[in-house]
A protein has these predicted regions:
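Polytopic transmembrane helical bundles with strong interfacial aromatic enrichment
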Residues: 1-143
Length: 143
């Protein structure tokens, strides 16, 4: 089995894991806002923190490491291809979104969240839209 294919498989697994977290955490925030009594708030805080620390953060790091490693193997000049440049921009956007969710998580931990469940429902669509675009870029690889 080649290093390239191994990295590619790990990359796909990491991306799927990261996307699961990016889609699920805002949904947890929705439920947290809508059921914010002291007892359920404690449970949501534990769930949210574990999702971020155990799944999302490692998956994002592995996604970046394997993605950059694959790029290195394919040749750094491939960055000049349109599809890869756009993919990098979108992965940076997902990383920024991840950072924003980390800030929201901190707000919940400190009981200072002031965002509505409607807000979290709305932003929950962001990673889905980016995922759709990235999949089309990877499959069709526009020049």
């Amino acid at each position: 089995m080649s290093l390239y294919l191994t990295l590619k498989a790990i990359h796909v697994i990491a991306v799927v894991s990261w996307m699961v977290g990016l889609l699920y955490l805002p949904r947890l925030f929705v439920y947290h806002v809508e059921n914010n009594n002291e007892q359920t708030s404690k449970v949501f805080k534990i769930m949210e923190k574990r999702l971020m620390k155990i799944i999302m953060n490692p998956a994002m790091i592995i996604t970046w490491i394997t993605g950059l490693s694959i790029w290195w193997i394919l040749g750094l000049e491939t960055i000049f291809s349109l599809w890869l440049s756009l993919k990098f921009i979108l992965v940076f956007a997902l990383s920024g979104y991840h950072g924003f969710l980390s800030k929201c998580l901190k707000d919940f931990e400190l009981d200072r969240n002031d965002r509505s469940s409607k807000f979290f429902r709305f932003i929950n669509e962001i990673p889905t839209i980016i995922l759709i675009i990235v999949v089309f870029l990877v499959i069709f690889k526009p020049a």
